[in-house]
């Protein structure tokens, strides 16, 4: 005996709870582009993704005062560094260049860009652009956190030593 489509949808909705959900594909979650993000860029990606709704991919704002300060951001410099990193990774796509009275807008790179009522600088897409697939980890890129040297202990000495290099 099989359930009807409506009953199956109702069961699926109950299983995930009543809240909205975000379509975050597993190939994106497992990608080198996502793995290489700094913690601030990862947080910003989630803050941008939290603005997503069906039919509005491309309409996410990173306005510091009106949107992101309430989400815990305290530094514009940190925000813009994380934003630059996300755009370079291809995980987000700028859909409108900001100006004096309009903020820049962004889309999630693993979803198709929607129309959003003629306020974007780019056309809607039928399928995702997936620029994040072309991301390559830069081995020459220095980490934002300094390398912490490994501390070695000699069993016959009471003080640890730090190896060279």
Task: Set out the residue ranges of the language-model regions.
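Pre-recognition alpha-helix immediately N-terminal to the DNA-recognition helix
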Residues: 43-47
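Intrinsically disordered, low-complexity and often Lys/Arg-enriched segments
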Residues: 1-8, 137-165
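Append "and, occasionally, other polyanion-binding protein interfaces
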Residues: 17, 23, 60, 64-65, ...
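Winged helix-turn-helix DNA-binding recognition segment
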Residues: 2-3, 31-35, 40, 51-112
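Short, amphipathic alpha-helical interaction segments positioned at domain boundaries
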Residues: 110-144, 148
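Positively charged, structured surface patches that bind polyanionic biopolymers
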Residues: 1-39, 55, 122-131, 136
